[in-house]
Design a protein with these regions (language model features):
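N-terminal active-site segment of His-dependent metallophosphoesterases
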Residues: 1-76, 80, 88-95, 105-109
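Extended active-site neighborhood of metal-dependent phosphoesterases/phosphodiesterases
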Residues: 78-173
């Protein structure tokens, strides 16, 4: 925030958007209200309100960006998050998404993976032994999420490239 120490960090944490195509059940109104609130806090509206504008360093979006992990849902989500970034005065590469259970496309068939990789108890234990091997079970089911992240913020580590973690070191802006 303006007036605070230069090393202070300001961010917005959002979660559970469940972006979908089709009927939105009032989602547009809620998202519009969120954009209005962010615009107000970022000083883009109502300059007479008496408070200094909030300078945001980044936006974190945790879990359930999509409704069911499909590519079309991420198109909707990306469009909104880019609009949010513009209103907040934050570059899109300062948006940090983290997937949730709805970001996994559970409709994708696991049978081919199971047939190819799991034969007997020892093999099952081997697959679940490390974060990297566990991540491989879901890599295909996170394909739409990975494509979304690559478009939104290409510098991020994404599951297939960094098995076992979604961390990212954020330089100060």
């Amino acid at each position: 925030m303006a007036g605070e120490a230069d090393d202070a960090i300001a961010w917005v944490h959002l979660s559970d958007f469940h972006f979908k195509t089709g009927h939105d059940y009032g989602r547009d109104e809620v998202q519009h209200a969120l954009l209005e609130d962010i615009a107000m806090f970022a000083g883009k509206r109502d300059p007479a309100r008496g408070a200094e504008p909030l300078h945001l360093d980044f936006i974190v979006v945790t879990g359930d960006i999509a409704g069911s992990g499909t590519a079309d849902e991420y198109v909707v989500g990306e469009r909104f998050l880019r609009e949010l970034a513009g209103v907040a005065g934050v570059p899109a590469d300062r948006i940090f998404p983290v997937p949730g259970n709805h970001d996994v496309d559970w409709t994708r068939d696991m049978a081919p993976f199971l047939r190819e990789h799991i034969v007997g108890r020892e093999r099952v234990e081997e697959v679940w032994k490390t974060p990297a091997s566990r991540r491989s079970v879901f890599a295909d089911k996170l394909a739409a999420y990975r494509a979304f992240v690559s478009r939104l913020n290409p510098q991020l580590r994404i599951p297939e490239e960094q098995p076992g973690g979604f961390g990212h070191r954020v330089p100060r802006s």
